Amino acid sequence: MARRNLLIVLVGLLAAAAPSAMAGQTQVAVAANFTAPAKEVAAAFKDKTGDEAVLSFGASGQFYAQIQQGAPYQVFLSADADRPKAAVDAGLAVADSRFTYAIGKLVLWSKSLDVTKGDETLKANAFAKLSIANPKSAPYGAAAIEAMTKLGVYDAIQPKIVQGNSIAQAFEFVDTGNAELGFVALSQLANVTAGSRWLVPAALYAPIRQDAVLLKTGANDEASKGFLAFLKGPEARAIIEKYGYSLE
């Protein structure tokens, strides 16, 4: 009887362990502006499928350089459309997997100044430091320079600019007071009440189309393909919209 009971317990334990043992995992490179929504999407994906999306955050340009060098990412969520396209063109990504998962919005934010009329704040130039993300590796940084150029203030402000390696660091400079104001992604302010902000008019910068792509390293991985499919679905799209992004 004891042996039979032990057998029943073991069978039960094996059955309980089976789903986790079969669960997949995908390595995802995520543009820093998408940090908070990506965490929510990954949690919802795991709840629904049991598969885990392991997220790494940083600047899109830095990720693309790492992918070119053979970094083991399987999915790439960029802050632009150019780098995922380049990955496809270079044979590093699956050709028909690329799609726009979000369209980003640029914001001028300050914890100490009133920037609700951001164009006037920039033209007045009465501040010491303004932060942006590195325009060479972060699309939001390039958008910030484009906006300032169209406003005719870039040349005057340029000596005051401090650059973060990513949009996350640009946010951190303002958050810690190392810059009085800075250009960040609207998504980064979803849960921030401190300070004031100015939503930069869309006419001042090219649309920030954020594309996702399945890398060749994940071409045969079900968790990687499943994560991208989930990202296109209604649950993920609701999360993305909650953080202020537009959708196609």
Functional labels for PLM-detected ranges:
Residues 1-2:
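N-terminal secretory signal peptides that target proteins for export/translocation
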Residues 23-57, 61-69, 78-81, 85-91, ...:
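Exported/periplasmic ABC-transporter solute-binding proteins
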Residues 5-17:
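Bacterial N-terminal signal peptides
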Residues 96:
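Short active-site loop at a secondary-structure junction
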